[in-house]
Amino acid sequence: MNYYNDFEIASGERISILFAERNIYTFSEAAQYIKSLPYKRNKNKKDIACVLIDNYGTCSTKHALLKQLAIENEQPEFKLMMGIYKMHACNTPHIAPMLHAYKLEYIPEAHNYLRYNNLILEFTSKKSTPADFIPDLLEESEILPEQVTDFKICYHRDYISQWQKQENIPYSIEELWEIREKCIKSLSEQVLGA
């Protein structure tokens, strides 16, 4: 049972048409389709349709696409959120060796998801749920679909820089970003079974 407005896709705009071409006619069908696609970084994140073109995506591209679908179909109650949470060995076991190697308890990670009223909607992968990150959520803000690229990266890097200073982390922002990239690569490889 869905606890959100499962609207029919009725718009004649680009994203709605791309879903209709795949015989997907409601938001819940679109969300389940997107959730079933593999987790992998897209080739051209600036194209909002990249998930449908590549047949895979990340939390950013998948949720931005669903938000754009909601916009096209005049459903403003669906909000695209960017949260910063503590990514650590308990909520992301695949990165435990990397964090241990660098003697880090956690690293702040930016995550995108949708909110419908007070309900958190998570469509990153088949197994992902809000419980994966909500207990460790540090902050969140609403963003626009086009902000999942440059804006998200800048915001995330600024957050890590502040965290590094406040916690006296013995790495530069560049080193921390590289550690984070290694964690994400490790996670992607585990998710893809590589």
PLM region descriptions:
Residues 26, 62-63, 106:
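Residue-level preference for nonpolar/small residues embedded in alpha-helices
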Residues 54-61, 93-94, 137:
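Short amphipathic alpha-helical patches
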Residues 46, 82-83:
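Proline- and acidic/polar-enriched loop/turn elements at helix boundaries
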Residues 1-57:
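Secondary-structure boundary elements
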